[in-house]
Amino acid sequence: MKFQNYKPIIINFLHKLIKFIPIAGIIIFIYLLIDIGIEKIIEAFLSIPIIFLFIAIFLMIIRVILSSLKWWTISIKQKIDISLFKIFKILLICFFYESITPASIGSFIGIYYIKKESKISWQKSFTNSLLDNAIDFIILMLLGLIGSLLIFNYYPEIFYMLFLIFMIIIILFLFLMKEKRGNWLFNFLIKPLFPLKIRDKIDKSVELLYEDLPTFQDIILPFFIGLSVWIIFGLQVYTIAYAFSVNIPIISFIFIYYISLIAGLLPISVGGLGVREGVLVFLLLIFGVPPATTFVISLCSHIIGNIFPGFIGGLLLIRKTYSIGKNNL
């Protein structure tokens, strides 16, 4: 039986699988609620002093501004004509889509808005968004790797797993940053999959992907801005933890939290919900932190750090949708 006969069955199966996978995170989240106890979680939420919430919100604002600056710096290096303020608004919209999609894949909605606002090609916009997200992911993996060293005596397998993923990502990044190697990959693996009549168009698309691509020297500044973004995010989360008088050194807590963020990127949960909380509860048991406290720290940090800016991004989308005659952000 030919592949074409199986194709509808395979596509139907994949559609069902894609719909089901994000539910896994929700199931984990509900299980944690029941296992820990809803009353304990509510009690922990209500015990957070308001001043610590305001400090966390302030750090979130600084983080979003710096994230915008990082993305804008990359855009400038790519000769993309767009203002920092527009990047800021696009980033808020990305936060909205991140919070409602598995593996934060919604952040790539920025491809559409960058193209629309700067009138560049889809390929160049794709590279811009991919590079911004790749820098973020590499930094997060590096910080998570450091965190895994802090708990190596308890869970050495976490270090080995993160190290393997980190090395694969770095090798891919270094490989694809060079146009010749990127062309070779497309010609060897991807181009043969397409009909002969459209292969010339594919060649042109690959060329546009590398149009004005920043050099390694160009991404040093965005890298360090991105590093400061993740450090501030860690401080934001620790602010909530400090409100509970969690007896963990700040460095240890922040770097261990990064591991839970990496786990939250698995495509089995919407916005990392459930997976992130479950992993952090598991890891902080080493330090004797009550599960209800850890659950609230993680969830509250997610609400302030992602849901809140995502809510503002959602309002921007509504304003754009219902504003007559306004095509731009």
Predicted segments, located by residue:
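Membrane-embedded alpha-helical segments of transport systems
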Residues: I93, Y97-T101, F126-S148, V296-F311
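Transmembrane alpha-helix interface/packing and boundary motifs in multi-pass membrane proteins
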Residues: C94-A103, Y258-L273, E277
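Membrane-interface alpha-helices at helix entry/exit sites of multi-pass transporters
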Residues: L84-I87, G106-F108, K119-N133, P290-C300
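Predominantly cytoplasmic-facing regulatory/coupling regions of multi-pass membrane proteins
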Residues: M1-L92, L150, P156-L265, S298, ...
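Extended non-transmembrane interhelical loops and adjacent amphipathic helices
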Residues: F88-K119, I202
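Re-entrant/interfacial helical elements at transmembrane boundaries that shape
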Residues: I105-K116, V270-L285
